[in-house]
């Protein structure tokens, strides 16, 4: 019988997959601001998925990639917003 924690992890993984699809849909809008929101949401979703994969399967490099995404994602968003502002 599956442990409740394993069921919760797989449920979170499935919901993050749905959120990732929604974030890609938001990012493909014609508005630049909505694109930034969508990419930021996708960044958070992928980082969370990678941390969850690290926790579930013990794959170490997933954690490192997730930390890099979390640290570099806002930097890219701020840089792109400054370029748009002019």
UniProtKB/Swiss-Prot annotation:
Molecular-function GO term, any one: monoatomic ion transmembrane transporter activity
Keywords: Cell membrane, Membrane, Transmembrane, Transmembrane helix
Predominant cellular place of this UniProt entry's protein: membrane
One protein family per Pfam: MrpF_PhaF
A Gene Ontology term for the protein's cellular component: plasma membrane
Topological type in the membrane: Multi-pass membrane protein
Keyword Membrane attached: yes
TM ranges: 4-24, 34-54, 64-84
Family: To M.jannaschii MJ1223.
Name the record gives this protein: Uncharacterized protein MTH_1250
Source species of the chain: Methanothermobacter thermautotrophicus (strain ATCC 29096 / DSM 1053 / JCM 10044 / NBRC 100330 / Delta H)
Taxonomic path: Archaea, Methanobacteriati, Methanobacteriota, Methanomada group, Methanobacteria
